[in-house]
């Protein structure tokens, strides 16, 4: 793959964020031997907000995650975000919805929490069923690798046609009066 001439010379130094841990894995969703899966676990009690596509035909992961914002979650449940690249899990009908349910259920089982506290995102090929087992079988490995760092690996895991990983950071100080 040819790297864009606009690519920065290095990935920026992104600091860990207290209360968040992440891990990546090579699930082989579309390509073998490529990091294509990212998981983020937020401590129990984390408040969440999200921005979703305005597309009139959102995929099953978007539908699930929109509902997850409204579902009641036990106060001691961690929040999870699971993102895969290689398959968008869109326009495969019931198979898309089944893959979402299996992924959220297994993520909650392995990482702790409830399926309703799992947010899902998929990017990649449209119209092909997603084999959720390729993702869920990596969860034990990812759980044992959870760490506060890993932003560059996370950026690489969600690349589709990108030629380089992208990252940015900004620090903000707020005064409470």
Model-derived segments and spans:
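A glycine-rich phosphate/pyrophosphate-binding beta-strand-loop-alpha-helix module
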Residues: 77-86, 90-145
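Short capping/connector residues at structural and topological boundaries
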Residues: 67, 130-131, 163
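Contiguous domain-boundary segments centered on the initiation and propagation of an alpha-helix
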Residues: 142-173
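Glycine-rich phosphate/pyrophosphate-binding loop regions near the starts of catalytic domains
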Residues: 40-100, 110
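N-terminal amphipathic/basic leader segments beginning at the initiator methionine
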Residues: 1-53, 57
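Conserved small/polar residues in nucleotide/adenosyl-binding loops
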Residues: 175-177
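Residue-level detector of flexible, active-site-proximal loop/helix-junction positions
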Residues: 46, 125, 165
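Structural beta-strand/beta-sheet cores of well-ordered domains, especially the beta-sheet scaffolds
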Residues: 35-37, 60, 156, 168
